[in-house]
Amino acid sequence: MEPVSTGAEAGMEGAGGDPYRRPARRTQWLLSALAHHYGLDRGVENEIVVLATGLDQYLQEVFHHLDCRGAGRLPRADFRALCAVLGLRAEGATTAGQAAGDGNSRDVTPGDAAAELATDGDSDTDEEARLALRAEPPELTFRQFHARLCGYFGTRAGPRLPRGALSEHIETQIRLRRPRRRRRPPCAPGPDSGPDCERVARLEEENSSLRELVEDLRAALQSSDARCLALQVGLWKSQASTHEMGHGGPEAAVRELRQAQGALAAAEARAGRLRRGQAEVRRRAEEARQVVLRSLHRVRELEALAQQVPGLQRWVRRLEAELQRYRSEDSQLPTPQLANPEPGDKSNEPEDAGTRDPDPTPEGAWQSDSSSGSRALDEVDEQLFRSVEGQAASDEEEVEEERWQEEKKTPAAEAKTLLARLSSCRGRCDDQTAEKLMTYFGHFGGANHAHTLGELEACIAMLVEQLRTQGCGGRTLGTSEEEAELQQKVEENEHLRLELQMVETERVRLSLLEEKLVDVLQLLQRLRDLNISKRALGKILLSTLDAFRDPTHEGRPSPAAILDALHQALAACQLLRRQPSAPASAAAALTNPLLVSC
């Protein structure tokens, strides 16, 4: 193999402008092959011997080694780095063709040199060659890669002989692989040429084997050259990036340091926000736990109150029965007996008996009091009759009667008071009033008490008339103590009614709250079975709590509203939409320690 011309090598080195040293031969093989293919180099140089499988296969191997990703596309930066390694500048006019022309200028005439200078000075051709390399897309396919390189040398080659590409390729391959040599006439077979012919045949076989070996070595050398060219491109890119970084100097280092400090500050800020968020989550979880504990404590209190409800209900029923009994006894007073003086006595007895002890029935006392009152009135009538018949009594009896009236003036006034109280009584009088009345009637049983008995008869008649007109519709209590006691019982009854109503309302509210808690626990159990992440569950809880921290909500939200919103947020989870709804038996089988049995 012959060394390449020094002029071509110097031209290539000058055109490349390579910032680092590279081997003198290996990176120029592709340029020589392209220049020879497009007629820019008139001789077969040493670099052309690597063209074992053709130019297209050579370019494909180079593209394959440059495309390290295996995507079938070459980035624009890699293509520009390849052009820089090969010495092809889109902004320059120095090419491999010029280098080859400078190397061969010593073998041409002055006229040919002038023609070549005129051709090289053609600005249109240079502009087309530069545009062939400069107008590339962001990523190049193999077809575009092949078109860019071949187009660059095709615009520089100028007019060529009218030969087809296939015939030219075949002629080049024949000239490279089997160079022309002088043919010798075959030896005529002779009687003594047997060993020579065998030796010639053996040598020809060895030559063919060596030729095949050389072809294999050429193919391997071509692949190695493509790999070396790809490594040169990578080295060029790394040194170019290092060179660009070195241009900045301390300013670039300071800028990178500031960027690193900014990134560190941003990371610390994010970490701080995350810590604050975690603290907020813990605080809200603690608040939710306290709310649940308070609700549980309240539920237990309500359970204790609910246990007292049956006793209160029995008490209320007893009071209602007692009140109903009083009303029924008032309505069952007989109308014909109102003309007798007994109703006053009857009305004086049962009230006190019912006030003192509601359990015993007052019918027996009522009958006994009525019988005693009637007997006392009969005795009074008899005494009055005897006193009327004995008008001619002695003066001594009259004096004694006057003295007795003076002594008993106060009891007579008290009897009048009792009768007046009886006339204004709206209910039955107590036993004490009835006993006092019977006592005074017993004292007035003598014949000397005619005047007082007359007053009593007049008062009783007036009382009967009032009872007839009013129909015993209204009556007052015997004493202020009894009235206060009855009023206190009425107030206690009303208070118990209100308390019972409040307990019932609270029980209903807690039952609703319990149902919502059970629904929320069921949804949480289903989400736990679906392996929901803690982050997503915490996000749902925080979003629900944040919704009630909105200033638009007036006052403090109720636990029922919070549970309702949490139930809706959990029900809207994507995991529950993907899975079928759980059967009703699963909801019934859920055990909850917060359940209240009312």
Swiss-Prot record:
Residues 343-359 have a biased composition (Basic and acidic residues). Keywords: Coiled coil. The keyword Coiled coil applies. Residues 175-185 have a biased composition (Basic residues). Residues 196-303, 479-533 form a coiled coil. One of its GO terms (molecular function) is calcium ion binding. Residues 394-404 have a biased composition (Acidic residues). It comes from the Eukaryota. This is EF-hand and coiled-coil domain-containing protein 1. The gene is EFCC1.
